[in-house]
Amino acid sequence: MNKIRLVVASLLLGAATGFAQKPFNASGTGNPIIPGYFADPTVKKFGDTYYMYATTDGSGAGFGPAQVWTSKDFVNWTLMPMNWPDSHWIWAPDVMKHTDGNYYYFYCQPCMIHCGVSETPRGPWKNILGESEAVLVPDRFVTNAITLDGQTFVDDDGSVYLYWGTWGIYKGFGCGAGKLASDMKSFTETRLIPNTEATDFFEAPFVMKRKGIYYFMYSSGSCHDHTYRVQYATSDKPMGPYTYRGCILETNTDGTIHGPGHHSVLKEGNEYYMVYHRHDNPHSNRGFHRQLCVDRMEFAEDGSIKPLILTHDGIGALASSVVKSKNLALGAKVRASSFYDADFRPEYAVDDNNGTLWRPRGMGQEWIEMDLGVARQIQTIWTQFEYGTQFYQYLIETSVDGKHWSVFADKRNNRLAGSPMVDFGKVKARYVRLTFTGGQKNGFGGAVWNLKIFEGVEASAPQQWLGLTAADWNGREWQNNEGMLGGAFTLKEGSARIQRIGGRDALVLEPGTTLEYSHPLLSSSKEHTVSGLVYRSGKWQSYEAESCLSSGSITLHSSTEPLVITNFRFYNWKQEAAEKAYDAETDIVRLPVANQQKHGLVVSLSADDFVVNDTVPYLENRGVKGYFEARKLPLVVKEVKGKKAFHFEGTQVYTSSFMLSATLQDNASYTLEAWVLNDSISENECVADFTTSHDELEKIMLVNGTEPRCGVINHYGWYEDAGYKDMKELAGKWQHIYICFDGRMEQVYINGKLVSEKDIQLLVKPSQFITLGRNAEGDWPFTGYLHSLKLWDEYLPLKE
């Protein structure tokens, strides 16, 4: 994307509309309002807190995890994990508070809607019908309404309505609507709102009422591109019939607000605000890296909605800011170990803009350094990494002179996901350096939306400050790896060991043992929740840990009996009873760290290792280890047009004796090279399938087919796959296929010609074996010749 062109266009647009529109990459923009990729937002205010429920985007196709963002001021948002949904897809969540005092959470999978219930807007949730994935609204529950995107509306009399639908553009189709019974488990009335009333209805219905008018708003077009937009119709009844009124939200002139839609509305006093998603800048392939924005709604005297003026400014704070200190990092001089390109330069980490990102060039250890100009007192640093729903490991150091460095926060063993990551200390320094050292997933690197440095203590984000399991004991310390404060309980006296008891791993403090955790922000007088699980009298039970807390420390002590403990938690906010009860029954999730110990060459096969006419039941892998074994018929080595080659006739299938290296999981960089000749190329022929999984974006499959969409490399992703339109012309000729992926861009070359280049994202899962000659499902037999095959777990650009 040409950013200069976009900035100029933004300025021209501002002049044309009569106000100074900020460029999308200016410092301090209010849109996007959240640092990360999220879509399909529902915004609610419960009490004095704003809640943002949204599809977790940037992870394929809304694969979760479940989360909610909370804010007291509508500017500073904190990501909070939720226990449910736990399904494969978690799309388009909506939450409402019922007159019965409970909160109801609606979400969808294709094509069904589920409903959960909780005593708090944060959960814990459980499916209202019992089983976790029990369905409230099955597909076509209302004839010709494809079930998706459920959204509630509560009328003045307390009646609750649910609206849903997708692909409502077909003749006779539209949006499903129903009035829920008082038990929230059934409907007393349903209706199809046809697309003759809601013109071009595609999906994402949202209903609100103002001055006696019911507004039925919805999204039209494709969520993948610029055609996505919001339109509306009105009625004097919640179920209609409705009258179409027009379009109120669409892509702006310069394309920096691209594909806006799937919205909700927040009413604050007499003001109305529309929260919607738009595509990221620069626009990612497929359109599944969406970001949340908000702009003001205005109404004409007749009640019609004026087309929204979309901005990069947003609306600002709706309450007093919870942050009291100045952000010292804003506009600071900055340098970094690397940056991907001009769209992701280091300055974007210190611009207080949730739509711009510093992305390092590599996926290994990378650093970014800020110069504050003069030495300043620093007590808090917020880091907003690219993906708040996965954990990052990092080190923050400070320096007065840029030469001698001291540790401010050591999170190199962190396993807690969150946004912002909040680190506290007290130091006077001019320079601050963040070093990314690893994390939960391969191939995502240490990209950062914002780094914020504060002179004061900024502890407003509601988070889990301490989280410890038995696995966090290293023989000397009990490390706080699942807690935001980091650090560790130190062994003051006695001894401790890990033991499995009552179905759980526990830390056993022998009699007379004392562990102590110190941090100046710990206090019994401040709002908090502290808890743990202990094993007593033959069962696990809640640990009354309040007595362990004093000003600045927590002390665990076993007197005459061992203390058997795990799941020790401390929150800097007060949990409700239901949340405490859930913690008392639920283990802290301790996810593994991604394997980043690269092997280099993982797979290496060559027909040059054999003699012509050899029959080959086994192929030794000259990469990391192992071999490939024929399932039935073995290959025969032939001489074809100057090269030795393994001859596949559609019946030979080989599987590896080894798993795919863990270094190739998730979105890891890779390079794939092969020499292939195929006399008669079919639509889809699989040369090698490196993965055994078969879900979206989980494939690395080398294909030799004429299918222009996926005839060269297949990832099980409609947008991510790549083919070659002129593949038929290569029949009977040697093809040198070279594919390289750096974690963002994938290039595909055939005989030195670049045939595909695009940004993609992969979600490769653990794979039990590699398959040659067909895919892992046993389909797409290969009928051709393979001279050599190589796979590296690193990015190796093709040399000229």
Could you tell me what each predicted segment is?
Residues 351-462, 570-572:
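Aromatic, loop-rich ligand-recognition surfaces of beta-strand-rich domains
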